[in-house]
């Protein structure tokens, strides 16, 4: 797999050797606090920050024939197309930084890289018509400068199509596919193949994700206009139309009221609660192959790091007793921006299981992120994640007779929530 594209950002390991933890020499004044020695970061974050720095430097000295800063420009998707290249096959340290215990790429770090790349592209698209001072704040990409801000509004469903090996070169290809008046949708594809030319092969795409950013005036909070997009190729036009349809659907859902339960759904609600009441009222007679939803909960508190996936993975692991395998994360809406230094509380639980497929039972995990401010006694929900896992086949093969337990609700509120998620 080659990285010859002029818009390809190569990733290098951040340590010189497994025993040398001194970060590579560079101008630390150009990096935010989160990238100083001792702070958490992935190698991609460093590479992307360097790329952002070049964007901002070019804006400080615009060419004489540059259009006025207030003028909206029209760009093509190819103008924003950017590639991140991971030379796993030749960089041992980089491999170890991304390797999980099962010799695959750590999905949690990869999701962070996707978020960082999408944020960089959104800045590039928006800042082409601005030379304002800019500051980048990490996870959940709350990007802002003096007068305007870019916020991650939502992430569409992310599906892992095949395992991602840590021994084979990897790349992420991303570009803007749709622009509204104040919204940007960016599509990212994670590509991995033993072949060098993999761009045209659908089989090489391991994961696809779509990030939606919105531009806001920092003073008024109102929508801020952004550069227009003009798709050229048939594929670009198709992606634009599909994104436009998704945007219209999101608007329709936001404007809709909560539906009342129909008669058939009341029966489902009663069925979900029936077994849970036995656990509450007659625990000695309860089904040993089932468990109450509240008994699957885990919780973690930390200072703003992208750990929702890691907590979901841990929840699935402790629930199943075998190594879980990630399948997908559902659409995510970011209700509140999260800044570096914010105190986050992550709460997770197994919401429900799907046991109809014996060879591939499904574990549905909910992770709720709360932004907590003890000084003002405030706790707000930032966003809610829904992850889907199964059990690794090789782990299940080593445990004959393995069977996942059924998760049942104990309250009507829990039962309604499960039904809402099943219908989502």
Predicted regions and their residues:
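Short amphipathic
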Residues: 75, 79-91, 294-303
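HotDog/MaoC-like acyl-thioester-processing domains
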Residues: 2-62, 165-171, 175-264, 340, ...
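Extended repeat-based solenoid scaffolds, especially LRR ectodomains
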Residues: 246-297
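Active-site helix/loop of acyl-thioester processing domains in fatty-acid/polyketide metabolism
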Residues: 105-146, 300-324
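Alpha-helical transmembrane segments and their membrane-interface boundaries
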Residues: 90-101, 304, 319
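N-terminal, polar/charged subdomain of small-to-medium soluble alpha/beta proteins
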Residues: 30-33, 67-73, 77, 325
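A cross-kingdom feature marking solvent-exposed beta-strand/loop segments within repeated
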Residues: 131-137, 143-171, 196, 321-342, ...
């Amino acid at each position: 797999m080659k990285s010859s594209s002029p818009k390809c950002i190569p990733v290098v390991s951040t340590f010189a050797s497994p025993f040398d933890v001194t970060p590579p020499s560079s101008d630390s004044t150009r990096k935010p606090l989160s990238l100083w020695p001792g702070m958490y970061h992935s190698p991609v974050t460093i590479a992307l920050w360097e790329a952002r720095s070049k964007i901002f430097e070019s804006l400080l000295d615009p060419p004489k024939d540059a259009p006025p800063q207030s003028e909206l420009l029209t760009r093509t998707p190819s103008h924003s197309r950017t590639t991140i290249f991971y030379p796993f096959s030749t960089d041992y340290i980089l491999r170890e930084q991304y390797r999980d215990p099962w010799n695959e790429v750590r999905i949690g770090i990869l999701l962070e890289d996707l978020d960082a790349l999408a944020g960089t592209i959104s800045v590039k698209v928006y800042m082409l018509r601005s030379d304002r001072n800019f500051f980048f704040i990490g996870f959940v990409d709350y990007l802002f400068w003096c007068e305007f801000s870019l916020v991650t509004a939502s992430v569409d469903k992310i599906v892992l199509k095949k395992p991602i090996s840590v021994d084979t070169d990897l790349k992420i290809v991303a570009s803007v596919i749709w622009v509204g008046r104040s919204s940007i949708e960016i599509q990212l594809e994670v590509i991995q193949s033993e072949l060098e030319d993999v761009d045209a092969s659908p089989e090489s795409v391991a994961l696809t994700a779509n990030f939606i950013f919105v531009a806001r005036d920092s003073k008024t909070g109102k929508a801020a206009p952004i550069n227009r997009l003009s798709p050229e190729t048939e594929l670009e036009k198709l992606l634009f139309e599909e994104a436009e349809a998704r945007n219209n659907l999101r608007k329709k859902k936001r404007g809709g009221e909560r539906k009342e339960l129909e008669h058939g759904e009341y029966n489902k609600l009663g069925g979900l609660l029936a077994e849970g009441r036995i656990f509450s009222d007659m625990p000695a007679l309860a089904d040993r192959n089932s468990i109450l939803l509240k008994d699957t909960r885990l919780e973690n508190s930390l200072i703003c790091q992208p750990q929702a996936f890691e907590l979901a993975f841990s929840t699935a692991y402790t629930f199943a007793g075998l190594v879980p395998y990630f399948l997908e994360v559902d659409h995510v809406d970011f209700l509140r921006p999260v800044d570096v230094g914010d105190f986050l509380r992550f709460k997770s639980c197994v919401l429900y299981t799907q046991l109809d497929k014996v060879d591939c039972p499904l574990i549905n995990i909910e992770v709720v992120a709360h932004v907590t401010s003890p000084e003002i006694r405030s706790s707000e929900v930032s966003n809610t994640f829904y992850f889907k896992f199964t059990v690794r086949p090789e782990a299940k093969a080593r445990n004959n007779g393995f069977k996942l337990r059924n998760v049942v609700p104990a309250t009507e509120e829990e039962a309604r929530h499960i039904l809402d998620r099943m219908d989502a």
